Design a protein with these regions (language model features):
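Substrate-binding cleft of secreted/luminal carbohydrate-active enzymes
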Residues: 285-294, 314-381
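Active-site-adjacent "subsite" loops/lids of carbohydrate-active enzymes
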Residues: 35-50, 128-178
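Conserved small/polar residues in nucleotide/adenosyl-binding loops
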Residues: 435-439
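Aromatic- and acidic-residue-enriched segments that line the glycan-binding/catalytic groove
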Residues: 83-95, 129-155, 193-212, 260-263
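Catalytic domains of carbohydrate-active enzymes, especially glycoside hydrolases
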Residues: 54-79
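Solvent-exposed loop/turn segments flanking beta-strands in beta-repeat/beta-sandwich domains
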Residues: 415-431
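Active-site neighborhood of glycoside hydrolase catalytic domains
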Residues: 182, 187, 196-249, 253-259, ...
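Pro/Thr/Ser/Gly-rich low-complexity, intrinsically disordered linker/stalk tracts
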Residues: 374-418
Length: 439
């Protein structure tokens, strides 16, 4: 097969910034597992509860100052959660003890604080992995491996939900239902919605014999993951049609005509079919984990966009590789990738992880806040969910008050409901306003 090699020097002879769009997803993953991003303090007293909350507020304030607009807040890790659940226990990272009540609801707090800052909050849920044997043992009788053994599989010193068991999708939907019905989240974001690495050895022969219905093992496994996606997507839309459903698949879908995936891809290696999900209309956004450089990034990012069926493609960028302990990337690599994303008119990008933004690793935060995200951006519209604009407000009144401040008041329309809830954007300029400009 012939492949096209992407010559970056031709694509970007210099690292000028592509014009900022008015609509763009600017997302960051807030990782709770092991306290990688948050929290650093255990909530065991009124003082430490306040400190834990302040740590999250500091993150949100800094991201807001850089004009981020989407927070992917880790809500489920591996068989445990960061909200009071009737199904799974609290993650130990909150208090130092599995199941320990932190004295507040972290997910509700995150949603409220994001909305105060005009940012969306998406509940990031790890789906199939349940953790290693030590972690599962720490959950005791609260672990799903004890309560629903039939849907759990031990494999390579870890436990996983079994995608081939019909009850697995029901179990995951119960968790999703708790979150979507109980919280004003703007989206649910699914991680590890796939088979594990080295999946050909996954111990599901019994289920395959029972449920395959004439399909090959590869097709059956791929259909299992797609059926989970389909079931959850329809369930979310039945509850709250405006809640966005997204996932972060493996960064390479499969070999492309431009470049090979070199054996690691979503479709064949871990049985994900995200392009099929977008084509079927059962996924609103994908955040492919594009933690690659050069020809391992650009051809595959473009492939996602070309096969998106109009759904939103938001490449996840591996900014953690800017740290010398993680990789040897220079910031120019991230700059080129962000410029490419804009030039190809993708919906935006996500940054993994928040820690490296907070620490301004290689000046990445300064570059975003001062240049690339210098102006705020609105969320890209999703016309397949709702193409009816909210009714405009009325009775706009401008009042000049003390110290050079101006107060705006208006009467909100009464025919807008939760399905069509407006967010107001205020433009200000000393010159003639240009509404299409992000500045």
């Amino acid at each position: 097969m012939r492949y096209t090699i992407f010559i970056l020097s031709l694509l970007f002879p210099f690292l000028s910034i592509v014009a900022q769009p008015k609509h763009e997803v600017r997302a960051a993953w807030v990782t709770a597992v092991y306290g990688l991003d948050w929290p650093r303090t255990r909530a065991t007293t009124p003082q430490t509860i306040r400190k834990q909350k302040e740590e999250l507020i500091d993150i949100l304030d800094k991201l807001k100052a850089a004009n981020f607009n989407t927070i992917l807040f880790q809500t489920r890790t591996r068989g445990d959660v960061l909200y009071p659940s009737a199904i799974e226990p609290f993650n130990s990272i909150l208090t130092g003890k599995t199941g320990g009540n932190p004295g507040y609801d972290p997910l509700a707090f995150a949603v409220e604080e994001c909305h105060k800052r005009g940012m969306e909050c998406h509940a990031w849920m790890v789906t199939i992995p349940l953790g290693n044997k030590k972690h599962v043992a720490s959950l005791g009788s609260q672990s799903v491996t004890k309560r629903m053994k039939e849907i759990c599989v031990p494999y390579k010193r870890e436990y996983f939900l079994n995608p081939g068991h019909p009850a697995t999708k029901e179990y995951l939907m119960k968790l999703v239902r708790e979150v979507v019905s109980g919280y004003d989240v703007d989206g649910v974001h699914f991680d590890y919605l796939r088979y594990p690495e080295n999946a050909p050895l996954f111990p599901d022969k019994y289920d395959f014999r029972r449920y395959n219905k004439g399909r090959t093992l590869d097709q059956w496994r791929r259909d299992n993951i797609s059926e989970i996606v389909r079931y959850i997507y329809k369930g979310v839309k039945a509850m709250k049609p405006w809640v966005k459903v997204s996932t972060c698949p493996v960064g390479k879908y499969r070999d492309t005509s431009r470049y090979p995936s070199r054996g690691w891809n979503a479709f064949f290696t871990v049985y994900q079919d995200p392009q099929g999900w977008m084509g079927e209309g059962i996924m609103d956004q994908i955040y492919p984990m594009m933690y690659f450089q050069g020809n391992n990034f650009y051809p595959f990012a473009l492939d996602w966009q070309e096969q998106s069926n109009g759904r939103q493609v938001i490449p996840g960028l591996g900014i953690y590789f800017l740290h010398p302990d993680e990789g040897k990337w220079t910031r120019d690599e991230i700059d080129r990738q962000m410029n490419f994303i804009r030039k190809q008119k993708m919906a935006g990008e996500g940054h993994y992880r928040v820690k490296y933004l907070m620490e301004n690793t290689q000046g990445i935060y300064d570059e975003l806040s001062e240049n690339f995200y210098a102006y705020p951006a609105l969320q890209p519209p999703m016309p397949w969910l709702d193409n009816v604009p909210p009714t405009a407000p009325s009775a706009l009144k401008v009042t000049h008050i003390d110290n050079g401040y101006t107060e705006l008041t208006w009467q909100a329309a009464t025919d807008n409901d939760q399905r069509n809830k407006p967010m107001y954007v205020i433009y200000a300029s000393n010159d003639c306003l240009l509404y299409t400009s992000p500045s």
